[in-house]
Amino acid sequence: MFSGALNYMKGLVGTNENLQVEESGDNKGDIEPEQRKGLLKQLSSYVGKDITSLISLPVWIFEPVSFLQVMSEPLQYNALLSKASKQDSEFLCLAYLAAFNCALYSTAVRTRKPFNPILGETFEIVDKKGEFRFLAEQVSHHPPIGVSETISEDYTLQLETLLKSKFYGNSSEVEIDGTNHFFNKKTNHHYTWNHLVTCCHNIIIGSLWLDHYGDLVIENHTTGSKAVLKFAKSGWLGAGRYGVTGEIVDCEGDVRYRITGKWNESIQLFQVMDNGSSSTTSTCLWEASKEPINNKFLFPRWVEENVIDLNDEYKKILPVTDSRLRADRIALEEGNLDVAAKEKHNLEEKQREDKRQRVAENKEWETAQFKKVDDAKFGYRWNYCGNYWEEREERVKAAASN
């Protein structure tokens, strides 16, 4: 979906806080030779394989967030989703959904891997401005699947991420299976979109850099209109890198708008005239933030304030399953690497022991907040069917009375 795949990929190769996944003339993207040798030794037996769940990585390459927390990071672009929902035109709704999907990839600056969620782990965000609420749950460990639902007065967004990664020697690819569902409450239109391929180049030799490529299709299943975005694969010497082009077409296949730009800079929208040519003027749908990032882990301010923050109020109302409360995450954020490594090991061993217990008792894992249901059109969907928010309200009331 999303930036989560980027951070997962970068975590497979990130080794220190100074590592930048970008081309560089001053070697700031390089890994130390001894670290590369160790990485090569670890990965050499996995060439051509899905390594998502095969490798146990040392704690020093992690960032102090769980992948469920990373799943929430697209909501820093909630304004684009709200703007999409408020459009009278289905084509302009598609345009802002396209901008949202481009914006996700603009934050590819972090080089560490998020922690793998524990089965049954949850994460919530209740927006401080009251614009939305977000809930995610890790519903499967093998394969690793996280699902989430975001609800606002304008839309409902359902996400599913099933990561698959393959190692090819000096590069590695991450693909995400799963369909994202967007429901526009103003028009009652139902949209879906897929994911891109993310490739990390020069894992062993050269300066690390990321590429995101493929076709991203956003479809309006109510009317049949769609936006088709083409993320260019970087060519020789970086030709075409970051480029995005696209078209928004109606149910008859006629082009109504064209999209162009770079996913790390800005996205422009051009209306198509009756003669098929593009308008000479454009609308800027989105422009990358130039806000400086000054913290150790390269978290944007929005992430610091909404994803990482664990204040006294949260401690009183969060369930024990929330990602913020993971002991390994907290220790890592505080710089206690030895404690973080120990707590990470304890969590993983507890998860293995729980699985052995279920196998011995012939029991299947039961999700708490989301259920996989049959869907005639999409095969299946993950629907929220828990009582998380009701229980949260009770915890809030209890905390207020103390």
From Swiss-Prot:
Coiled coil: 328-361
SUPFAM superfamilies noted in UniProt: Oxysterol-binding protein-like (SSF144000)
Pfam families xrefs: Oxysterol_BP
Keywords attached to this entry: Coiled coil
Gene Ontology CC: one annotated term: membrane
Keyword Transcription regulation tagged: no
Swiss-Prot/TrEMBL GO biological process terms: defense response to Gram-positive bacterium; phospholipid transport
One annotated GO molecular function: sterol binding
InterPro entries xref list: OSBP_sf, Oxysterol-bd
Family: Belongs to the OSBP family.
Record-given protein name: Oxysterol-binding protein 8
Gene name as annotated: osbH
